[in-house]
């Protein structure tokens, strides 16, 4: 998205520049080969280095002779050496890794050793926003005239065009109006001159263009890529958001784009380009590293952090995961130094001058003129010297912010290079300027067009030759000469006190749909894998074949929404509708597929007809009528003498013992399992968000189900002559202004007479304030208490917008006494429903708080809260709704929030930055922890924003309704709110050891119990019900169950995905003898101080021993197991940075199929599955 230019006057400061040690040109041509220093180089002490160099030849000769004699003695004459690691990057130089001492795997105190942490930066920086002059957020940059005498400045100008897949237009509108013309222009203009270069990022547009392009255009683009003129950077389906996106979806969107690119053009990206996400997550750095990426470029980080890093020449660094004590996750990063990625803010520190070199702003083009008053002019023989020197001055000033004498200059903006004339204006003028600079040796500079690969390769080569390391710097063995850094870059501020924390919550309805599509897609992928694994080819290969294009469409619709104006909620209203419609269509398609797949997996349907064209016997129990409608439970009409079949699918790796629910129209019903054995059950009245009619007249039916890991289980809902007790009705109590209270039959109702009420199970008791329905505290089984202090509040925010959160003061409580409170106590579920009274006629929120009493289930450990939110109507304009838990945990205003559902990040509330700057993304989990080890966690199944503004507080924003645009290009507010439900799981835990959150700055992990609770919330059981009832007297068919795993996986091992990557090429791969399945695993790191609870809940094993693929599946034989990258394209583990001790043994060894995974790691494997003979 474009930015208006940021103009200002300010004061001066400066830094010196570095010099190198060689002068001749080392700028690579398009035909240059990569010299890639991927692995670690041992760091030596100076004396040792000097000794080695002085005696190098003697040492080398002696070592070589000894090695030769040892080899000859042990093995005889060696044969040819072959490598099992085959890769397209044959020119890579792999260097041996240094030895690093391992630390305890689940020690919460272990962490990375680095030079810089983002916490250190926040502690040090004063956030004064001082005026820096022409570079408003920096200082007046100067340099010495002789800085480049020993080594010339090498300048790479990188043309690019940022193409948002949806923002102010839909993705298809952008393609038709702009992106297809841009790609046509790139192909034509680059083909004219081999000196011209370009980079492209978004595969969603390239794939769309490819479908329309003629064979000649396709061939021309492929040639440009192969010749190095056009580089595909990132290569994901989109340039994803990094705050709200879950790591599952990030992996999916990058893999979808990378695999299409590799299949179509035959290249695999290795440089990431992320100029527009609004803040950066360290999870992204990890995922890219494990996909084989070597370098990253980022732009939108806090302007004060940029300034500090620039002052210390640390804008290029090695990003290391905070938990990585062994330095296996290192990736090289280039951070752009200025306000924006447009041309005025990329050539140097003075935008008024840089804008004069954006030749698309010359009169006659459609772009706005430079706002500083001086405009670009055509370069001629008469003005080339003056223009070149002015441009080179900016290049030199920018280069002083970095350590090396290799300089990157992006040249582009949103949807640029749309016409031949525009592209020619840029290429023509810049080439003339380059020619002048390059033909004058006295300037000590060489400039040319380049790609990211050209730049990063040259930087690495220079760093190999010139020692830029500083005394005492930890750095990295991967690329020497640069500092190491850990942490993330949230929350982003681009100027003054404008913090981009609003988009963590904008359009929360669609953030929730995003997660539903994720877990539904994952479930469908798992079912597809078992279908193709178990089925004989002739019998049922036809079944999934015609669905494969819908599966691909679902992957791509999920990927599209990960765009940094999609899941962020920062697009125009009708563009949001387009995203929502695409996701809704895919949800429907996936549910239909799953409903048919269960028939095959349970052996219900085996007709020879093409079964994917015939109607299914089942349908999803929850359905959405349209893209912006809440899911509605389809009620089961259990008439006398009938039974309804219910099929439950468990997407978890462990057996699920869980209380499940469906909605029924009648109360006189019973539940039976697949053997027609009676199952105890409970009914409760269904309540709704309506203070004039609290009860719908329908009932929630609960029973405890047991479903095998990744499996299916059948239950029956019966009404009639069965030898089972009817579902037990819950008992209701109320505090309400209704007189008389509308007690629904067949329930008994009594009045709440006290100021407090309680619900309880064997683990905890919840205490509520009857006057306002809020949760006061949790009383634990041992008598200890956790104060919760639940409070609903609102910010008044007239300056907030889709991106920015700018509140006018603190949030004020909105709940008043004397609302409706109804408690429901039953056999399996205890619930408190609260419809609070507020100053508005219709409350914007109601809630249900539940405890489960299933017995030995994960649910028993949590407090489940459903917030029904309706921030609808003008009464709520410029309001932002929050829930605040005012606990008694002495957290010192330190809290932890997750990054992309993958890892936790330590957060600290700073008084020196405004309230909005202390809000952070919460994709799925936040917790606070006290000095006595008491921990209070909130799990969410959608991304939101979280803060801890005062001692013991944990505050989460639920929704926001904003009238005004916040000046970041969208041109509107956020007024399209939808009714929605936000679900939290609260968990209060006691530690067996004490830890001060303020003094301990290392990363914290969730407990094992917390991990499992989060997984159950985000990967719920999928429920399907029969479309037609059956006669209760006919007890057939007995569908039974489907249990594909030989045994549940270890509790700390999570299946991220189990899929057939190329379902449309499934048969072809069989003929090519390639593994057709992919299994992605994550081993969870957990806080061992809390292990005692987690092991009590159906947790029989941990992944301390290697995982054995050969005995993982019950009736399937796994073979051809090969480790691969997370984008499923690389098979060289050294490229991916994995620790040597994790690498699998050669396939010729008897331990084939056994793999070890370290905590925190995500590993991907290709494998083949066939039924046992």
UniProtKB/Swiss-Prot annotation:
Its EC number is 3.2.1.114. Gene3D superfamilies: Glycoside hydrolase 38, N terminal domain, Glycoside hydrolase family 38, central domain, Golgi alpha-mannosidase II, Golgi alpha-mannosidase II, domain 4. Glycosylated. Its main location: Golgi. It is found in: Golgi apparatus membrane. The keyword Cytoplasm does not apply. One of its GO terms (molecular function) is metal ion binding. Residues 72-1173 are lumenal. Zn(2+) binds at residues 162, 164, 276, 564. Inhibited by 1 mM Cu(2+) and by the class II alpha-mannosidase inhibitor swainsonine. Binds 1 zinc ion per subunit. Not sensitive to EDTA and not significantly stimulated by cations such as Ca(2+), Co(2+), Mn(2+), Ni(2+) or Zn(2+). One of its GO terms (cellular component) is Golgi membrane. The keyword Electron transport does not apply. It catalyses: N(4)-{beta-D-GlcNAc-(1->2)-alpha-D-Man-(1->3)-[alpha-D-Man-(1->3)-[alpha-D-Man-(1->6)]-alpha-D-Man-(1->6)]-beta-D-Man-(1->4)-beta-D-GlcNAc-(1->4)-beta-D-GlcNAc}-L-asparaginyl-[protein] + 2 H2O = 2 alpha-D-mannopyranose + an N(4)-{beta-D-GlcNAc-(1->2)-alpha-D-Man-(1->3)-[alpha-D-Man-(1->6)]-beta-D-Man-(1->4)-beta-D-GlcNAc-(1->4)-beta-D-GlcNAc}-L-asparaginyl-[protein]. It is an enzyme of class 3 (hydrolase). It holds the Pfam family Glyco_hydro_38C. Belongs to the glycosyl hydrolase 38 family. This is Alpha-mannosidase 2. It comes from Arabidopsis thaliana. The lineage of its organism: Eukaryota, Viridiplantae, Streptophyta, Embryophyta, Tracheophyta.
